[in-house]
Amino acid sequence: ILMLTWEYPPRVVGGIARVVNDLSKRLIKDGHDVTVVTYREGDAPYFEVDKGVKVYRVDNFMINPNNFIDWIMQLNFNMVAKTGEIIAKEGKFDVIHAHDWLVAYAAKTLKQAYDMPIVSTIHATEAGRNSGIREANQKYINDTEWMLTYESTEVIVNSNFMKGELQRLFGLPFEKINVVANGVNLTNYTGIDRDYDFRRRYALDNEKIILFMGRLVYEKGVQYLIGAMPKILEHYHDAKLVIAGKGGMINELKQEVYNMGLGD
């Protein structure tokens, strides 16, 4: 199995890195051979075996610092070149698993060059992130998402809502889309005692905590949760909202909390 992803630990931009990391290691446990080709950031090794997963990382070069799409296309070229080297030494893969539009052109090129099928996971859509398509870059990404789903034998999404969104946006056949929900590896949290002193930093013992954990970016929707707090407090006077995360909206969200008089 060839995994194509623009992020893989130690590079973590969003949720894709965590999904690919956990999925790859679980597939190894199930007896599969998994190779990840991804972007190299910082001093991460060009090659390593991570609990059975073979991880190849490629450099990338910013031709135009102001154009993210140019950067992504260059990354796709480098992924194709690296995968070609791997195939020359080890032979073809049985399947390409492509994660989001960011690796779509690498996946399509490798499919056509080596006759390998694609399974793609669409973690989110450009239309969904932005409540529609309005700009040229958004249209480009939307079109690339369609192309990836068209080239894929099977498409994976993590919810029935996303399945409906892909059908509406791209006209995909119902049977082509498979819902595989994201999960949590509970073994990472076994044996951890409840830390009441830590909880008391944010709420009294008799108060309820609403916890948000995630990137502080528009598409995660934390702004709507903040906006709903006055209505929640009308019915649940003992509720506290705790937001854990970082991202480009952090200062905007802090200002919104201040403007609404919700901060401590």
Predicted segment positions?
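Short His-centered aromatic/hydrophobic patch
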Residues: 98-103, 122
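A short helix/loop element that forms part of the nucleotide-sugar donor recognition site in Leloir-type
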Residues: 47, 190-203, 209
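Nucleotide-sugar donor phosphate/pyrophosphate-binding loop at the beta->alpha transition
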Residues: 116-119, 127-147, 193-194
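Carbohydrate-associated surface elements
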Residues: 40, 161, 183
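Conserved donor-binding/catalytic core segment of Leloir-type glycosyltransferases
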Residues: 2, 204-220, 226-229
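N-terminal subdomain of nucleotide-sugar transferases
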Residues: 1-54
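A structural motif in glycosyltransferase catalytic domains
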Residues: 20, 27, 210, 225-226, ...
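Nucleotide-activated donor-binding/catalytic signature segment of Leloir-type glycosyltransferases, i.e.
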Residues: 244-245, 251-264
